[in-house]
Every structure is written in structure tokens, then in C-alpha cells.
UniProtKB/Swiss-Prot annotation:
Annotated segments matching region Disordered: 1-66, 260-297, 398-422
SMART domains listed in its UniProt record: AP2 (SM00380)
Listed name of the protein: Ethylene-responsive transcription factor WRI1
GO CC annotations, alphabetized: nucleus
Modifications made to the protein after synthesis: Ubiquitinated. The phosphorylation at Thr-70 and Ser-166 by KIN10 facilitates its degradation via the proteasomal pathway.
Gene: WRI1
GO MF: DNA binding; DNA-binding transcription factor activity; kinase binding
UniProt biased composition (Low complexity): 1-26
Length: 430
């Protein structure tokens, strides 16, 4: 720029020839580097044409001979990639993105992984590394799941997967005890469901498969063939495949019959025990009745013996006949004066003078029957029974010389050793 300014100053001079020479020389200097730029463009264009042609010698520079496989320059592993044209790359704002399929130790394993992913994306008509007939079994399995689930299963089989994670789906090594644990995600709104720990990866993978079929149906992604779990699922009451209504009803009837038979087999011994238990009570009741009858007979015999003993005592020693005394000072019923309540009446000054006192005057000239009823009014309602028997009265005729119809018996006890109570009974003879 400084040179151009100097040239402009020089052009102001009256000589016009000098200015014309400077203007003609500047474009010549600026056009000198242009051929170099053209050479760079020519070098880049043929290299781009060669990259599109797989048969060109430039293709020999690729890290792998298989389609979709490249070798990592640092790790040395072979990585499988897939270009998904149908997806939209939001980062670069363009259509299509690269899908990572995992890193493998062998080049052939990475090539097989690419073929499986290509079959899932574009079908059997796409270009593969190996013939499509080698993937007949995998074609059936991949049709049950989505693209994302199948790609995740392919990545798990790669050797470059995170350490501690098994090659089987839903299986990982426990960080404490080193055993293999199984988990399944997105069950009942939870992040994952813990299925337990196992000694081998295969056992944990089978546990995951069972849970996946139970919660996600027959179309769930499993580590092994679903036919290996049909018997186990039936025992749990899980039927992964659709069943006809007729066959389903027959199966229900068969299961119901089996349940009834098992219940009957369990209830038969119980019924026998119940019958034995029911047969035993009548024998016990008969024995109890016999014992009661024997007790009653023994009580009756005891009562009869007690009555005989009482009668013998009364007839022999306990009967005391109260005869009338010739003394006018005593009455025939003076046994009543034995009570302490009548002791004041027995002490009289006339007794010292030997003057007889007529005691009936003390009772206001009342008859004997009225007085005796008044005295024994409280005890007249008590009945004598065999249990409370203290005294038994034996009536006998009064002697002809006595004018009073009363005969009284008194005893202190039914036996000389058992009781000490006093009881009185009177018998009127008309």
C-alpha cells in the first residue's frame, strides 16, 4: 500500500509516461501466484474421484477390506459404523448420521455386526460383506424388536463395551462380590428391577429373559431362544404366545380337575380323623352316664344307711320320755324353761316358802298350743330332710294315767361325736 501511495504522488508530476508505466506493472505482479492455486485445485479433484471408486488403487489405503469397518489408530481394534441416511443430524443441521456399532478384536466380527445392522435398516437387498444366507436365524430374531433395541444388543456383544458388563443383555458383574447380577429396566414406572445375583453369566441371562417375557410379552428381546422358557413360564401362569379359546378352556378345565383331585386327596385323611373323633364321644357319654348312675346309687345307699343309724340311735339311747312329775311345781312342758330367756321366772321368793306357783298365769292364761306355736313360730317353716337330719321323732301313745296329750322328745345330737346343735320336735297325738 505504501508503494501505491508513492506511485500516486509520482503521477501528479507533469510527466504522464511514468504513471502509465507504474499502472501497467502492478497487475503483472499480482497475477504471478494464480497458477499455484490452480495446481492445488487440480490435485484435490482427482483424489476425490478415486475415493468413490472402490476398485481404484487409492482404496488400498483403507484400514479394512470389509464394508463399514475401520481400524482405530490408537487401540488397534476394528470398529463398525453405519451411515443412517433417514435420520436428521441436529448438530450439523443436515440429513444422515453415523451410527456406532462397537469395537471388536477381529475384523470379521466387526464385518458381521455391520451386516446385521444393515439387514435391520435396509433389508436383505442391501450390499453385505458376507452372503445373506448366513443370517437366516438372525433375520427372524431382529424382526421382533425395534432398531434401537437391536443396535443396543449388537453393541453389548462387542469387546470394547464397558468393563464389568457381560455380553448378555441385562447382566453385569457385581462390584462387591464379583458375581453376575441381572436387572431389567422400565418396569412399573421404575428405572430398573433387580433380579438377583448368579454364579454364571448364563444363569443371570436366563433370569433376565424370563423377566423380559413376563413383563414385555413374547416380542421382548432375549439372550436365548424363547422356546427354552415355555415350560417355566407355564408353571408361573405366563403364556407368551396367543392361545385359541377352545384350547385355553380345555387347559383351564384340566387344571381345575387336577386341583379338585389334589384337594380330595388331602381331605380324605382329614375326614377319617373326624369320623374317629365323632365316634369316640358317644362312648365317653355312656361312661359318664354309668358313673353318674353309680354315684346316685351310692348316695341312695348312704342315705338309707344314715337313716338306719339315726333310727337305731333314737330307738335305743337318744329317746328320753318326759313323764309327768308328781310335784305340782313342775309342768309337763317345763323343758322350755331350759332357755336362758326364762331364767328370771324360775327364781321366786315363794319357792323358799314352798308355796306352789301356777306358771300358766305367767302366760296370761293362754293355752299350751298357743304358747308353743308362739315359741316355735320362726322354725315352723323349716323342713327336715335327710341331709340336715339331727333328730327324728318317734311317736308313741301316752300312758292312760296322764291327762295331757303331749309327748315331747329332745336330744342334744344325732350322734355323740358329730354334732353339738340342739333341735326340738314335738308330736301331737289326738
Amino acid at each position: 500500500m505504501k508503494k501505491r501511495l508513492t506511485t500516486s504522488t509520482c503521477s501528479s508530476s507533469p510527466s504522464s509516461s511514468v504513471s502509465s508505466s507504474t499502472t501497467t506493472s502492478s497487475p503483472i505482479q499480482s497475477e504471478a501466484p494464480r497458477p499455484k492455486r490452480a495446481k492445488r485445485a487440480k490435485k484435490s479433484s482427482p483424489s476425490g474421484d478415486k475415493s468413490h471408486n472402490p476398485t481404484s488403487p487409492a482404496s488400498t489405503r483403507r484400514s479394512s477390506i470389509y464394508r463399514g469397518v475401520t481400524r482405530h489408530r490408537w487401540t488397534g481394534r476394528f470398529e463398525a459404523h453405519l451411515w443412517d441416511k433417514s435420520s436428521w443430524n441436529s448438530i450439523q443441521n443436515k440429513k444422515g448420521k453415523q451410527v456406532y456399532l462397537g469395537a471388536y478384536d477381529s475384523e470379521e466380527a466387526a464385518a458381521h455386526t455391520y451386516d446385521l445392522a444393515a439387514l435391520k435398516y435396509w433389508g436383505p437387498d442391501t450390499i453385505l460383506n458376507f452372503p445373506a444366507e448366513t443370517y437366516t436365524k438372525e433375520l427372524e430374531e431382529m424382526q421382533r424388536v425395534t432398531k434401537e433395541e437391536y443396535l443396543a444388543s449388537l453393541r453389548r456383544q462387542s469387546s470394547g463395551f464397558s468393563r464389568g458388563v457381560s455380553k448378555y443383555r441385562g447382566v453385569a458383574r457385581h462390584h462387591h462380590n464379583g458375581r453376575w447380577e441381572a436387572r431389567i429396566g422400565r418396569v412399573f414406572g421404575n428405572k430398573y428391577l433387580y433380579l438377583g445375583t448368579y454364579n454364571t453369566q448364563e444363569e443371570a441371562a436366563a433370569a433376565y429373559d424370563m423377566a423380559a417375557i413376563e413383563y414385555r410379552g413374547a416380542n421382548a428381546v432375549t439372550n436365548f431362544d424363547i422356546s427354552n422358557y415355555i415350560d417355566r413360564l407355564k408353571k408361573k401362569g405366563v403364556f407368551p404366545f396367543p392361545v385359541n379359546q377352545a384350547n385355553h378352556q380345555e387347559g383351564i378345565l384340566v387344571e381345575a380337575k387336577q386341583e379338585v383331585e389334589t384337594r380330595e386327596a388331602k381331605e380324605e385323611p382329614r375326614e377319617e380323623v373326624k369320623q374317629q373323633y365323632v365316634e369316640e364321644p358317644p362312648q365317653e357319654e355312656e361312661e359318664k352316664e354309668e358313673e353318674k348312675a353309680e354315684q346316685q346309687e351310692a348316695e341312695i345307699v348312704g342315705y338309707s344307711e344314715e337313716a338306719a343309724v339315726v333310727n337305731c340311735c333314737i330307738d335305743s339311747s337318744t329317746i328320753m320320755e318326759m313323764d309327768r312329775c308328781g310335784d305340782n311345781n313342775e309342768l309337763a312342758w317345763n323343758f322350755c324353761m331350759m332357755d336362758t330367756g326364762f331364767s328370771p321366772f324360775l327364781t321366786d321368793q315363794n319357792l323358799a316358802n314352798e308355796n306352789p306357783i301356777e306358771y300358766p298365769e305367767l302366760f296370761n292364761e293362754l293355752a299350751f298350743e298357743d304358747n308353743i306355736d308362739f315359741m316355735f313360730d320362726d322354725g315352723k317353716h323349716e323342713c327336715l330332710n335327710l341331709e340336715n337330719l339331727d333328730c327324728c321323732v318317734v311317736g308313741r301313745e301316752s300312758p292312760p294315767s296322764s291327762s295331757s296329750p303331749l309327748s315331747c322328745l329332745s336330744t342334744d345330737s344325732a350322734s355323740s361325736t358329730t354334732t353339738t346343735t340342739t333341735s326340738v320336735s314335738c308330736n301331737y297325738l289326738v
